[in-house]
Amino acid sequence: MTLLIDLIDETGQVSKEQLEEVEKLLQFAADALEVKDQAEVSVTIVSNEEIHQINKEYRGKDAPTDVISFALEEEGEGEIEIIGADDIPPVLGDIIISVDRTKEQAEEYGHSFMRELGFLTIHGFLHLLGFDHMTEEDEKEMFAKQTKILDDYGLSRSS
């Protein structure tokens, strides 16, 4: 199973090795979650200022956040199903991560920058796959999946 990943660090603050680790983690998660072969995802690393603007424009929240996901394959209510779409690899969507919040939260939670970057990446990826945390039950399921993927990959909270 190959996930096609477009990974961009607009800040220049994430090392080549860390970006490669994000790619490996996403491939690992895609395999674990049985994502369709050749599915596409983009991950963009931005500043607090940039994610603040995106959060304000698209979510109506006038503050920076850690991660935002824009799913492209969600079927909305009343949308017509496209015949043959199951044969085409899906474009899952975009994950946007604040490098500043990643650093802050890693320090706050007492683990590595890479563990926090991995957590935010998987959190955003699960949103692209339709998981959310709007109800307590959904939150438990989503967070259990996140933890399992990160632990199985080797990025546990102690990392």
From Swiss-Prot:
Domain of life: Bacteria
This protein's record includes keyword rRNA processing: yes
Localisation per UniProt entry: Cytoplasm
Molecular function as annotated in GO: metalloendopeptidase activity; RNA endonuclease activity; zinc ion binding
GO-annotated biological processes: rRNA processing
Coiled-coil regions listed in the entry: none
GO cellular component, one term: cytoplasm
Family annotation (PROSITE patterns): UPF0054 (PS01306)
Residues reported to bind Zn(2+): H123, H127, H133
Cofactor: Zn(2+)
Gene3D superfamilies xref list: Metalloproteases ('zincins'), catalytic domain (3.40.390.30)
Membrane-spanning parts: none
This protein's UniProt keywords: Cytoplasm, Endonuclease, Hydrolase, Metal-binding, Nuclease, Ribosome biogenesis, rRNA processing, Zinc
EC category name: hydrolase
Enzyme Commission number, as recorded: 3.1.-.-
Main location: cytoplasm
rRNA processing among keywords: yes
Cofactor comment: Binds 1 zinc ion.
PANTHER family in the record: ENDORIBONUCLEASE YBEY, CHLOROPLASTIC
Biological role: Single strand-specific metallo-endoribonuclease involved in late-stage 70S ribosome quality control and in maturation of the 3' terminus of the 16S rRNA.
Family: Belongs to the endoribonuclease YbeY family.
The protein's name in its UniProt record: Endoribonuclease YbeY
Gene field: ybeY
